[in-house]
Amino acid sequence: MSDVQVHQLYIHGRYVEATSGKTFNSINPANGEIIATLQQASEQDIEAAVKSAQQGQKIWAAMTAMERSRILRRAVDILRERNDELARLETLDTGKAYSETSTVDIVTGADVLEYYAGLATAIQGEQVPLRESSFFYTRREPLGVVAGIGAWNYPIQIALWKSAPALAAGNAMIFKPSETTPLTALKLAEIYTEAGLPDGVFNVVQGAGREIGQWLTEHPVIEKISFTGGVETGKKVMASAAGSTLKEVTMELGGKSPLIICEDADLNRAADIAVMANFFSSGQVCTNGTRVFVPKSRLADFEKAVVERVKRIRVGDPMAEDTNFGPLTSFPHMEKVLSFIESGKQQGAKVLIGGGRATEGELAKGAYVLPTVFSDCTDQMAIVQEEIFGPVMSILSYETEEEVIQRANDTTFGLAAGVVTQDISRAHRIIHQIEAGICWINTWGESPAEMPVGGYKQSGVGRENGLTTLGHYTRIKSIQVELGDYQSIF
């Protein structure tokens, strides 16, 4: 234990002792070892973070947009210089394969920051003439202090997705990472400070339990909450935010997304997409296409192609260069996923491959679940209805286009969807009828910085990334100017 580093809170440009006296551990899910101990924030610490953010935000907002842009661009450069170092830490904390974290997590997060750094100077109002002697103009002003609450599956990427538009618009952010994977958010705070961000503009407060999130959502100074996580927690966060000071919210919640394979689809392409849409990041992606709809006439061939590809997945030590599938992010989550797999078996689904925990050799020490494919699934099964957030694919057969559209939409979620077909007219026809916020045709999973992402139904409120998101970190002030005489009716 003496070799385990203790991490403090990051407030006002430096590490500070938490006042709670409580700590919690970060666990390497590949072997169960403690990799860090973290101090837990108290309500007093949240107050200090808010006060710091208020001070820093005034300095930050007073800078020119070009000055803010330059500082954010410097942070991008540092992120890219330290990509491998950050990726190793992300792998230790999350269990994701280093081959993934080194090429995706930091890379795509830095891309989003670079995108918004470029847009910082493009925040504009408008001027509208009313008559010869009068006009009005608008200003887009920062909200002030905002809060981000992150999820455990993409820690640094989510921290960047939330902080980039907020900071570009002139706000300060208090960020709470998931207690399961909190380490890279602290490194991001260091990088922002090194890049020249004024003290207090990005503070990190970590801790286990719901209290920290509640303190943030109910704090009267905080103007907006951006949350990524589960639906039930999201509902509570949204209710708390509305019940305190009517805060603005962005909610990126769960999904149970349909992937529709059409009868004319190239089978190899369809199988490749289905495997990526279910097993990338060990299945821990909110947009995963876990309900795979296949025409009855293609079902047997498709299942064979999928199983062949799953057999090629390299499960192993996430730090090994050839591993492309690591453990789940925590042992409690592993147990949850395994319980869903057992439910699928009990409800009559057929296991084509996988179906349990990986227990061979060193894998037995970690939170490893084998890539699992179920066939003979029905829409009523728990594995088809509920978000599992693990490496579990459910294959469902269908006969007509009308049928598959209806079944694809028969869910409380609406985050993502995909269609694989060689008929582009059919692709658009289907996608336009699917109730989902992020859709892919003949591909899956890419979320470029320029593309807004978010869900329909209970999968979320608002969007992240893209031009539209920047506007939601500002508020519009309208100013009318009268150049002529003023005439009162009194």
Curated annotation (Swiss-Prot):
InterPro entries: Ald_DH/histidinol_DH, Ald_DH_C, Ald_DH_CS_CYS, Ald_DH_CS_GLU, Ald_DH_N, Aldehyde_DH_dom, BADH. K(+) 1 binds at residues 26-27, 93. Disulfide bonds: none annotated. Keywords: Metal-binding, NAD, NADP, Oxidation, Oxidoreductase, Potassium. Its EC number is 1.2.1.8. Dimer of dimers. Its cofactor is K(+). This is Betaine aldehyde dehydrogenase. The keyword DNA-binding does not apply. Belongs to the aldehyde dehydrogenase family. The modification Cysteine sulfenic acid (-SOH) is found at residue 286. The record marks 248 as: Seems to be a necessary countercharge to the potassium cations. It is an enzyme of class 1 (oxidoreductase). The active site is at 162 (charge relay system), 252 (proton acceptor), 286 (nucleophile), 464 (charge relay system). Pathway: Amine and polyamine biosynthesis; betaine biosynthesis via choline pathway; betaine from betaine aldehyde: step 1/1. It catalyses: betaine aldehyde + NAD(+) + H2O = glycine betaine + NADH + 2 H(+). GO terms for molecular function: betaine-aldehyde dehydrogenase (NAD+) activity; metal ion binding. The lineage of its organism: Bacteria, Pseudomonadati, Pseudomonadota, Gammaproteobacteria, Moraxellales. It comes from Acinetobacter baumannii (strain AYE). PANTHER family: ALDEHYDE DEHYDROGENASE-RELATED. Binds 2 potassium ions per subunit. K(+) 2 binds at residues 246, 457, 460. One of its GO terms (biological process) is glycine betaine biosynthetic process from choline. Involved in the biosynthesis of the osmoprotectant glycine betaine. Catalyzes the irreversible oxidation of betaine aldehyde to the corresponding acid.
